[in-house]
């Protein structure tokens, strides 16, 4: 309906397209007008040349909801792994979606997807991890204007106020992270690529779980 409801998950890309490139994953569906989270993007397909790109996460409702996670890039056997899909945009209250992980390749791993940016209250999404084969991590999203923590691998801010906000939250989070293994506000860490490690738990108050590491 117009007021609420989560967006649907995007379809996974096909195994091959012309030229041996994996198909791109479908985009996650957008949520209802006011409430609901965006759907996750579909994973890119396997390619004998390049892996397919992960689909972007859907956008949340305008008031409350988180952006959908970007789909993971597909495995590229001969050349490059697929690029992870971008995380979706949240509502006024909600977290930006995590970028998808880059696809693996014996030649060049795909780059991780870009994390979604917070709006008012909420964290930026984590940048997706780079694929095995020296893929680069995606750029993390910036937190909401009023409250939130930047996502993993977010760019350094040029705003002194934003930098102060991030430093204060990091100090507040430290004892919670040490004692409980998760922050008060913030996202969990991404699992290391190639280890199959679980993503870290999100913050006690709010935060995305980190992306799981590839096997």
Predicted regions and their residues:
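Collagen triple-helix signature
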Residues: 1-154, 163, 185-215
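Extended, small-residue-rich solenoid/repeat segments and analogous flexible loops
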Residues: 155-191
């Amino acid at each position: 309906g117009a007021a609420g409801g989560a967006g649907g998950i995007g379809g996974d890309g096909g195994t091959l397209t012309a030229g041996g490139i994996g198909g791109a994953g479908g985009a996650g569906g957008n949520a209802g007008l006011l409430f609901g989270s965006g759907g996750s993007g579909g994973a890119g397909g396997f390619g004998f040349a390049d892996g397919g790109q992960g689909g972007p996460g859907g956008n949340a409702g305008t008031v409350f909801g988180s952006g959908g996670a970007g789909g993971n890039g597909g495995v590229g056997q001969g050349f490059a792994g697929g690029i992870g899909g971008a995380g979706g945009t949240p509502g006024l209250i909600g977290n930006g979606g995590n970028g998808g992980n880059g696809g693996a390749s014996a030649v060049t791993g795909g780059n991780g997807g870009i994390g979604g940016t917070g709006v008012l209250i909420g964290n930026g999404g984590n940048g997706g991890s780079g694929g095995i084969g020296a893929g680069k991590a995606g750029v993390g999203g910036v937190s909401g204007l009023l409250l939130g923590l930047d996502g993993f691998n977010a760019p350094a801010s040029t705003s002194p106020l934003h930098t102060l906000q991030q430093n204060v939250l990091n100090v507040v989070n430290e004892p919670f992270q040490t004692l409980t293994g998760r922050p008060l506000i913030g996202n969990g860490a991404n699992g290391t690529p190639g280890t199959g490690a679980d993503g870290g738990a999100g913050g006690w108050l709010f935060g995305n779980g980190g992306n799981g590491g590839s096997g």
